[in-house]
Swiss-Prot record:
This is Protein LURP-one-related 13. It comes from Arabidopsis thaliana. It comes from the Eukaryota. SUPFAM superfamilies: Tubby C-terminal domain-like (SSF54518). Might be related to the phospholipid scramblase and tubby-like superfamily of membrane tethered transcription factors. Disulfide bonds: none annotated. Coiled coil: none annotated. Belongs to the LOR family.
Length: 185
């Protein structure tokens, strides 16, 4: 499979918000539930509500304002997660699910809001290995890479390509890890 130049231009609409799109590549580190930039500044944190079922996670900014809510569909055999803008469970942005129940390599599909009734072809694909905790995120079923993640020393390192919504990518990374590990990063 051909690798894409990470400095190449991507023309992608912001999925979570335009404030999360940068014209240059962005490296983030993820340790536990905290996401930091290359200078060590906290960018995001993922919170798990204390009460209720533990099938929900909330991505918050450094001021604790909710950016997206990730909610696992409990009755799904494909580890389906639905993602909503902010804390409003009426404003669904996208759905993430395992492509099949039995896999040697993990393949997860992402369906944007407009594509959720058919789910015939995904809008994004995440491919990775369970044991290595590494993955690559592609546009649809193509070879166009928009982000790559690998495991560093006790943390994950993510490279998000230019013009890609990094809140969207961080959300996908957490869901991918939850699907793989069952516990989070």
């Amino acid at each position: 499979m051909a690798k894409q130049d990470p400095t190449s231009s991507n023309t992608m609409l912001p999925l979570v918000g335009s404030e999360f799109v940068r014209p240059q590549p962005l490296d983030l580190t993820i340790t536990g539930d905290t996401v930091k930039d290359a200078t060590g500044n906290k960018v995001f944190k993922v919170k798990t509500p204390l009460f209720g079922l533990h099938n929900k996670r909330i991505l918050v900014d450094p001021n604790d304002s909710p950016i997206v809510t990730m909610k696992m569909k409990v009755t799904s055999k494909h580890d389906r997660w639905q993602v909503y803008r902010g804390s409003d469970l009426d404003d669904k942005i996208f759905t993430v699910k395992r492509s099949s129940t039995v896999q040697l390599k993990t393949r997860v599909e992402v369906f944007l809001k407009h594509n959720q009734t058919r789910e015939s072809s995904c809008d994004f694909t995440i491919k990775g290995r369970f044991m290595k905790r590494a993955c690559t995120i592609y546009v649809a079923d193509s070879t166009k890479i928009i982000a790559q993640v690998y495991e560093g020393h006790e943390r994950l390192v993510a490279t998000i390509y230019p013009n890609v919504d990094y809140a969207f990518i961080v959300t996908l990374i957490f869901i991918f890890d939850l699907i793989n590990m069952g516990t989070g990063i």
